[in-house]
Amino acid sequence: MIFSYKHLKKLANLNEISFEDVIKAFNLIGFEVEETKEIRHVENIKYGKVLKIYKNENSDNLTVCEIQFKDKIRIIQTTAKNVEINKYVMAFIPGSKLANNLIESKLLKGIISEGMLVGFDEMLGFEIKLVPKELSKNVIVLDEANLNEDPIANLELHDYLIDLAILPNRSDAISYLVMAKELAAFFGTKIDNDLICLKNLRVSKINSNLEGIFVKSKTLELKLYDKYLLLKSHLKLTNTYKDLENLILIHTGMPIHFLNLKSLEKVNIVSKSSSLEIANRTLKIDNNLVIEKSREIIAIPYLETQKEFEIKDSQKEFFIFMNILSPKEVRKTIKTLKLESSQIKQATKTISHGMQLNAIQYMQSLFEEIEIVNINLNLKPKEILFDHTFINRIAGFEIVKEQKFINAKKSLEILGFKFFEDKILVPAYRHDYTGPYDVIEELFRFYGYDNFPILQPEIKPFKIQKKYDFKFSLASKNYNEIKTYSLVAKEDNNFDPFNFKTEILMKTFPSEKRRIIRNSQAFSLLEIAEYNIKRKLEKINFFDFGMINEGKRALIFASNEKSFNEIKKDLFSLFSYKFELRKTKNNYLHPNASAHIFYENKLIGWMGKINPSLKISDLIFVEILLDEFNISKNQFKEYNFDPLKFRDITFSIEKNQSIDTYLKELKKIKNIFEVQIIDKFEKNEKLNITVRILLEDDAIKNLDEAILKNSWN
């Protein structure tokens, strides 16, 4: 969008801020300045009051005007037909410049003309296509003017145009009022006009899906200053109500559509297919959005209006359509009708309800009386969490304690943000906010990316984390990998060695056989084993990695060739941890050939056979939950060439007492390699159990100390 530097400066109260500083500010807060252009097309023009008009008898086209200026009365001739007595004009007097051409007195058809009157074409040097023919032929005539004032200053004819590239998600910033707020936030000034303050407004709910305002206004006119502002934005002047639509658009970013309606009875916006005669053209509408009254199309939103429902310049009551339409539907309308307008182009972007409110507040200053229709004025601001620790982590240093960061928060407060201890309230017009990262980006752009300290990154050599290859190890132990489904039928999910509390039933599933996440991989593996046995492949040594209930990763391996102790050795050789096997009372496992696997008193798996009441099988299983502990490889230790020693210890315990307590204490002693029971006998109502301990020399001392401490035999 093209912005006027002088108009932005006035809105944002930037009295002492130069053009160069404004350009720098735009670039620093994230708006790319694509192009700038200085406007200095005229010099030294003056206001004058028309005292007398008469025809030049020597010419068919020239009219002689006697005009009172601040210093004296001058005679200026013109071909324009709209000059009236007691009206005011602007004129180039001798010594003025038009496009660097010096204006001097000149003899025209026998009468000296002391300058020339100013029209739209002369004023800014814009292309003629922006000005209607009727305006192009005439000069500018004013009802009031102060001869002591300077029209160049009043109309800001010496200005800079700033063409800004604005990101698609910032449709709110395609407006003077929001962009002025951005500058005010950067420079720490305050805008006089509070965009969010909406008071003493009449609000109505009407049986129609149209949103907007009813307007009552004594006059419908556009000031000359505003017309030039539209020309600066490269918007064509057409008629009063179209120019007002564009003026509201460039100030608020809200597309609007004026309609000659005094009520919304039987008026709605609908999708329709039809052939429509409008604006001397035939338009074919193909399921596009239209505004209809009593099922007759009266307008295409933000694009065209039937003549009967257009606003007349003298009209005092009308309706302003302000619906927020689907950008997809708007683009479809443009594609179908191959027509465009500044309003509908803006409607292709995301428009927020906050932008609606900004437009209503701005229109309060334009019209005497407005009535809100079907628009909610009490918008709840979006809340976003505000975590100082998180912001510091993203910044890479303690940014929240910096004065520049505190100033950045104050800048956001000027934009309408409200800060609390743990949250931020985002102004309603900022639809681009979705989470904490958006808040951080906003704070950082006002903190200034140039203010971030330049830190040398700490360079470290790459750490290669080797993944332990269970597959290779299991394959070396004569196991074959299989693949099973994580989903099973509900009736096949009766085996639960881990005692999960709930079942995960899928909302969408390929079939009833694949509906629930299994509690164990055992029955899936068993199903494949039985299939292979039926095919006369009777030697089973399988393993699989998969997911079970609660999303846990598990490893399972099973064999009908190996014994319990052989599979136990396979388990302990896979991991570098001291797992503990405990006798299980789980009804799903074989009571005499199964155990639970614990690590640091935490259940991490099971080993053994399935309870015959569930399934008769000679397979011995091991199933481990891989996420319950950190998997690491065995660490290298220098080899000790000394032969291992063994010690035998006999424990005398009660008949109903378990030997496990003593075995646990023995296994805590470092460099003990093996503890096994070698003998049992009863004597004097006591159970005597002899264990053999295989250990290194340096463990003997620790073992002796433990024997004395615990009074073992």
UniProtKB/Swiss-Prot annotation:
Cofactor(s) this protein requires: Mg(2+)
Q: Which InterPro entries match?
A: aa-tRNA-synth_II/BPL/LPL (IPR045864), B3/B4_tRNA-bd (IPR005146), DNA-bd_dom_put_sf (IPR009061), NA-bd_OB-fold (IPR012340), Phe-tRNA-ligase_IIc_bsu (IPR045060), Phe-tRNA-ligase_IIc_bsu_bact (IPR004532), Phe-tRNA_synthase-like_B3/B4 (IPR020825), PheRS_beta_core (IPR041616)
Q: Does the keyword Oxidoreductase apply?
A: no
Q: How is the cofactor bound?
A: Binds 2 magnesium ions per tetramer.
Source organism, top-level taxon: Bacteria
Query: One matching Pfam family, short form?
Result: tRNA_bind
The record's GO molecular-function terms, alphabetically, read:
ATP binding; magnesium ion binding; phenylalanine-tRNA ligase activity; tRNA binding
- Classification via CDD domains: tRNA_bind_bactPheRS
Q: Which residues form the tRNA-binding domain?
A: 39-153
Entry binding sites for Mg(2+) = 432, 438, 441-442
List GO BP terms, alphabetically.
Answer: phenylalanyl-tRNA aminoacylation
Cellular location of this protein?
Cytoplasm
A single cellular component GO annotation: phenylalanine-tRNA ligase complex
* Principal cellular location given in the protein's record: cytoplasm
Q: Which residues form the B5 domain?
A: 379-454
Q: Which family does it belong to?
A: Belongs to the phenylalanyl-tRNA synthetase beta subunit family. Type 1 subfamily.
Q: Which NCBIfam families match?
A: PRK00629.5-4
**Self-association state and partner proteins as the record states:** Tetramer of two alpha and two beta subunits.
Q: What is this protein called?
A: Phenylalanine--tRNA ligase beta subunit
Classification lineage: Bacteria, Bacillati, Mycoplasmatota, Mycoplasmoidales, Metamycoplasmataceae
Gene expressing this chain: pheT
